[in-house]
Amino acid sequence: MGCRILALEDQSDFVWGHVSARDPDGRGAWMKAATLGFDEIGPEQVILVSWDGEVLEGEGRRHAEYPIHTELLRARPDVASAVHTHAPWSVAFASTGAPLRPISHEATLFVPPEIARFTKTGDLILTSELGVDVAVALGDRNAAFMVQHGIVTCGPDVVTAVMTAVLLERACRTQIRAVGSGGPVTWSSDEEALSKRGNCYPPALLQQAWDYLARQVSAA
C-alpha cells in the first residue's frame, strides 16, 4: 500500500523509486521489485534483498540503488522503513539551496533544525560506500534532500516513512508557491513549529492520514 500511496501523491517516476521494510529476522530489507511502477506493486511484487544485494525471496530483480536502504537500516537501529523517490517539488526546491521554512503544518515535521542534505553526488547510489554517505548525511533525522536526485525519508514503520515523504513533498510545494507569489513570506517561529509538530503529527494522526490515502487508493 505504501507504494500505491506514493503513486497517488504524484511521487512516481516511471519505474524508479522504492520503499523498504526491515526484515524482522535480520536478513536485509523487503523492497519493491525493479522494473515496476509504484502503482503496480502488490504483495507479489515485493522481494527480500540481503545486506549485500542478493535476492533471497520473491520474484523479480532488485533495484540497483538498494544500498540506500541497506546502509540506512544498518546505521539506524531505530529505523524499520525507508523511502526513496524522485519527488518533483522536492527535487526542484532542493536545487535552490534555500532553507526549508515552516510556512505550513507539513514543514514543521522537518524544521527546526534544518533538513539534512546529501550533496556528495546527484548520480545513482550504486555502492555500499555511497549508501553509507547517504546515511551519514541523514544522521538522526527523518528526511534528507538528495540534491539533484530526490529524497530519502525514514521511520519506525512503513506508515511513518511513507507519510514523511508525502508531507515533505507537500511542504516543498507550498514554499515554492509562496515564494513564487512575489510577495513577502512569513513562517512559524521555532517554538511554534515544534509545538505544531507534536500537535499535528503524532503517530495516531499519521495513521489517520495513511488510512485516508489508502481509502483513496482502494477507490481509484
Task: Specify the residue positions occupied by each region the protein language model found.
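Glycine-rich flexible loops
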Residues: 1-220
